[in-house]
């Protein structure tokens, strides 16, 4: 158990007015704070309604006090929670009262969760899940984050780590005891176990990718010439009149944003100004901002007015626009206004990039676009039993997979046990980064400072 010499305090509830405000204290002097503020020693894990006292003995507030004796607390230390009225002035008065006591300081962002991690009350993936649960923007995200907090992700990672460790032991035994008559590397066990680990890791990666999509979402930019129907498409996808729609070209001058969910997948939709030669300074700024958003998009919906051209290849429709796009940019061509052209709505899988015919005005073909966007992100829509994952988790899983593949190649091609053992060690190291078993102090600092103060 990690020992901290100082005691920290912070408001655990959001700042602002509220019916209830909670102040959390953690550290070796939490019991002294309880004695000073409550005026008496508190029973462990027992809610007591009493006045909260100032240093002169007068009452500042009244409410519920809870004391948790370490290590049986969230942080693993002595913890005091004071639940009073949630006025911002009152909360500030209470915290200033506590800070006057010797050895108490304000908590850093995420420091309560950091202490819980350092005291082995939860691992790093679970600690991150606390922040993800608080920030969840949908029911699916909240459920996935809670499953991660309960250890669903960590359990899968730990199972992989254990499997890698056992295989390392077997391989290194073969290297260290070459005089044994059994050829450990060629008896099939190592190869079978390695393939099993690789398959299990790939399954975890697929689940983690779904969890990352639920957390991060997809940034989709609608771009094209003026009056192609971009704002109408934004309204159709969001289900409300987010953007003004007129027959006047250039109505949209600035970037418009909407956040929606498709079967639990967050979608950040951005409508941009029509791209053309600017006729004035305001339009020029709008077009510049449009290109800034396009450069940062996960996918661009290239909006085309179907009544102006029969072409379906974007290079034929607008070569200058396509040439300016990043090579790796995901692109979908949207032929709008099928209600006027008479074309059948839906997706055409023959084209590259994909082509979707729809009517942003009537909504025909919008469901095909929604399904297409899910497919583009590899989102299955099945979140039952899944967990939340972050970008760093995906990177660690990818690194581990790469090392296992290298080890497999060395084993199958050269029977190189020493190299396989090293690749297994590196794979184990990357997997352990997810739960914090092997993590740099710098990474821990970046993770916990992104938390709320009081968490």
UniProtKB/Swiss-Prot annotation:
What EC class does the entry list?
hydrolase
Residues that hold (6S)-5-formyl-5,6,7,8-tetrahydrofolate according to the record: 24, 81, 121, 455
The cofactor named in the record is:
K(+)
| Gene Ontology BP, a term | tRNA methylation
Cofactor mode of binding and number, as noted: Binds 1 potassium ion per subunit.
The record, for InterPro entries, names:
G_TrmE, GTP-bd, GTP-bd_TrmE_N, GTPase_MnmE, MnmE_dom2, MnmE_helical, P-loop_NTPase, Small_GTP-bd
Q: Which residues bind K(+)?
A: 227, 246, 248, 251
Task: Offer an example of a GO molecular function term for this protein.
Answer: GTP binding
Residues noted as binding GTP in the record, renumbered to the chain: 227-232, 246-252, 271-274, 359-361
Thylakoid keyword on record: no
An annotated GO cellular component of this protein is: cytosol
Tell me where it resides: Cytoplasm
Please state the Enzyme Commission number of this protein: 3.6.-.-
Residue span(s) of domain TrmE-type G:
217-378
Q: Which UniProt keywords are given for this protein, alphabetically ordered? A: Cytoplasm, GTP-binding, Hydrolase, Magnesium, Metal-binding, Nucleotide-binding, Potassium, tRNA processing
| Residues the entry annotates as binding Mg(2+) | 231, 252
State where it is primarily located: cytoplasm
Self-association state and partner proteins as the record states: Homodimer. Heterotetramer of two MnmE and two MnmG subunits.
NCBIfam families, per the entry: mnmE_trmE_thdF, PRK05291.1-3, small_GTP
According to its UniProt entry, what is the function of this protein?
Exhibits a very high intrinsic GTPase hydrolysis rate. Involved in the addition of a carboxymethylaminomethyl (cmnm) group at the wobble position (U34) of certain tRNAs, forming tRNA-cmnm(5)s(2)U34.
Family classification: Belongs to the TRAFAC class TrmE-Era-EngA-EngB-Septin-like GTPase superfamily. TrmE GTPase family.
Q: Which PANTHER family match?
A: TRNA MODIFICATION GTPASE GTPBP3 (PTHR42714), TRNA MODIFICATION GTPASE GTPBP3, MITOCHONDRIAL (PTHR42714:SF2)
Q: What is this protein called?
A: tRNA modification GTPase MnmE
